[in-house]
């Protein structure tokens, strides 16, 4: 066992003394059992994580029952909804790297034999996922689960995205204060990750097809007894993985990454999943995984399930309709869409895991014969603004919009754009360009949920587009193109767009272009000032120095002269 490094031999007597002092060693025989880390992310200010201490206790009990010795530690977490619209959002994506580094540090410093990861919200799941393939210790994931959808006084289903869009409607005068306050009070009625197919739930669903979590992980409610049963079940599976020495890199292969994007396309997941899954591929040592490959997957996978913010359906509706397993089963039966014979943490293949799954409500999950669209709900765009690619959630765009051509109105920050939208400087026919908000430029690639929600809240969801080297919340909908690469701070051509330039977003052809000759763009480049970091000290300064653009997954890159 790995843990023998800290508990066997005369030299480890001091370590054994310290282990006895933890209170986790209940009998002499415990030193001969596998040591299992519980990587938790309990935090009081994140509603998706307030109940995770209780779930960790369930995991501890089950791990002991299955023959292991549990040791819990905690990571940090950022709530994107609370951190939205101010400097806190600049810490959100960077927190992914802190979480990965922290988990790596504890796991490798203490030579654990297995790891039970309990994430839930936006950057916590991918951060832990990066740690799992980096340390490559037998591991399993079981998230905290989604919250229930809210309900307004008028009987309308609510999610957090309802509140963000209500801000724009209230400012516009099209919503009463009474209705506005009703939404605020009732949109998030329980603990758990936000109720729509936003980033947290998208990632937790992808864990099922990656093979790192048991069926039900993505949709079983946080407040249900079934969530506790998933934790127990996962603990026993983890002990089998430890016994058989099945490791994350045995499960997370190039085929698994392909299948994650296939499910993402079928359920119209958050665009942030593209960032995180590309980063995962890099961390797992999977080479040459790029945005063009994702487009190829999108072309062969139908769009089967529209969930909030693209519809009124919540994650609980998906669960009742058959869950992620029902969507995966449709892809298995489609043939050629995924690789169903890959091994998973259950010891079974994907095909075996979903063999008995079925669709219980064809309004929530469409059968493969009747998809929302024959192609996936996410699309990668390329063109002279985004030579390395950009991302759009086509499932969140009104179907009547196939090509959008408009006049650029440019901003160098999120805040400038929000002010212009709110004071009606932005009008019908505009393409709002927000640059210098990428991983390096932001820094931290903040989400542009406030401007997109204001656009939709003003009733301009089909009439105004927004493009950015920043990113979007999973709650974003509308004509919103993000992750433009290279970013402006890295000299990307989005920095060369001027007010009044005509920009064309062509969804069928997956292109994003500005109608300006190449030679004019090159002349503009000569006048472009050198980018200077916005933050000079602390973690964000270090992050700025090392981070890369979105087409890599926004990973940190060590200078080559330090590793050659």
Swiss-Prot record:
Keywords: 2Fe-2S, Amino-acid biosynthesis, Branched-chain amino acid biosynthesis, Iron, Iron-sulfur, Lyase, Magnesium, Metal-binding
GO molecular function annotation: 2 iron, 2 sulfur cluster binding; dihydroxy-acid dehydratase activity; magnesium ion binding
Binding of Mg(2+), residues: 80, 122-123, 447
Chain positions recorded as [2Fe-2S] cluster binding sites: 121, 194
Highest taxon listed in the record's lineage: Bacteria
Reaction catalyzed: (2R)-2,3-dihydroxy-3-methylbutanoate = 3-methyl-2-oxobutanoate + H2O; (2R,3R)-2,3-dihydroxy-3-methylpentanoate = (S)-3-methyl-2-oxopentanoate + H2O
N6-carboxylysine carried by residues: 123
InterPro entries per record: Dihydro-acid_dehy_C, DihydroxyA_deHydtase, DiOHA_6PGluconate_deHydtase_CS, ILV_EDD_C, ILV_EDD_N, IlvD/EDD_N
Known pathway: Amino-acid biosynthesis; L-isoleucine biosynthesis; L-isoleucine from 2-oxobutanoate: step 3/4; Amino-acid biosynthesis; L-valine biosynthesis; L-valine from pyruvate: step 3/4
Pfam assignment, any one: ILVD_EDD_N
Cofactor or coenzyme needed: [2Fe-2S] cluster; Mg(2+)
Official protein name in the record: Dihydroxy-acid dehydratase
Origin species: Listeria innocua serovar 6a (strain ATCC BAA-680 / CLIP 11262)
């Amino acid at each position: 066992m790995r843990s023998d490094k800290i508990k066997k031999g005369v030299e480890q007597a001091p370590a054994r003394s310290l282990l006895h002092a933890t209170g986790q060693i209940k009998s002499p025989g415990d030193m001969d059992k596998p040591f299992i880390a519980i990587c938790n992310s309990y935090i009081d200010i994140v509603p998706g994580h307030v109940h995770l201490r209780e779930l960790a206790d369930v995991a501890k009990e089950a791990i002991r029952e299955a023959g292991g010795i549990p040791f819990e530690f905690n990571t940090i977490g950022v709530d994107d909804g609370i951190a939205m619209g101010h400097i806190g959002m600049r810490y959100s994506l960077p927190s992914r790297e802190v979480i990965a580094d922290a988990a790596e540090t504890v796991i490798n410093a203490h030579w654990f034999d297995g790891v039970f990861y309990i994430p839930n919200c936006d950057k916590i799941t991918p951060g832990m996922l990066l740690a799992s393939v980096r340390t490559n210790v037998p591991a399993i994931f079981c998230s905290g689960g989604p919250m229930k959808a809210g309900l307004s006084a008028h009987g309308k289903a609510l999610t957090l995205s309802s509140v963000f869009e209500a801000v724009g409607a209230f400012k516009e005068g099209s919503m009463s204060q009474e209705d506005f306050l009703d939404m605020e009070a009732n949109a998030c009625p329980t603990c758990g990750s936000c109720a729509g197919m936003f980033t947290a739930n998208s990632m937790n669903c992808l864990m099922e097809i990656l093979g790192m979590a048991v069926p039900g992980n993505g949709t079983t409610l946080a407040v249900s007894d079934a969530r506790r049963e998933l934790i127990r079940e996962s603990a026993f599976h983890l002990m089998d993985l430890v016994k058989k020495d099945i490791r994350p890199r045995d499960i997370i292969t190039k085929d698994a990454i392909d299948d994650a994007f296939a499910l993402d396309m079928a359920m119209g997941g958050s665009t942030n999943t593209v960032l995180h899954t590309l980063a995962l591929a890099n961390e797992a040592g999977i080479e040459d995984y790029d945005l063009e490959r994702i487009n190829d997957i999108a072309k062969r996978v139908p769009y089967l399930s529209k969930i909030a913010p693209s519809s009124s359906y919540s994650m609980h509706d998906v669960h009742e309709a058959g869950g992620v397993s029902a969507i995966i089963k449709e892809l298995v039966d489609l043939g050629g869409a995924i690789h169903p014979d890959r091994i998973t943490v259950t010891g079974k293949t994907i095909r075996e895991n979903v063999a008995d799954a079925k669709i219980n409500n064809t309004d929530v999950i469409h059968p493969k014969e009747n998809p929302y669209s024959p192609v996936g709900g996410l699309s990668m765009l390329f063109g002279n603004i985004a030579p390395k690619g950009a991302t759009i959630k086509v499932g969140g765009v009104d179907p009547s919009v196939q090509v959008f051509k408009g006049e650029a109105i440019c901003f160098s920050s999120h805040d400038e754009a929000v002010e212009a939208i709110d004071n009606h400087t932005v009008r019908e026919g505009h393409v709002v360009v927000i640059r210098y908000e990428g991983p390096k430029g932001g820094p931290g690639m903040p989400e542009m949920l406030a401007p997109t929600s204001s656009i939709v809240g003003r009733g301009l969801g089909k009439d105004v587009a927004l493009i950015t080297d920043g990113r979007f919340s999973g709650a974003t909908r509308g004509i919103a193109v993000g992750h433009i690469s290279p970013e402006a701070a890295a000299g990307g051509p989005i920095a060369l767009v001027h007010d009044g330039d005509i920009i064309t977003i062509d969804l069928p052809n997956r292109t994003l272009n500005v109608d300006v000759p190449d030679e004019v763009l090159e002349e503009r480049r000569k006048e472009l000032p050198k980018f200077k970091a916005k933050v000079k000290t602390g973690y964000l300064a270090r992050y700025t120095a090392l981070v890369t653009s979105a087409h890599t997954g926004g990973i940190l890159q060590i200078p080559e002269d330090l590793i050659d």
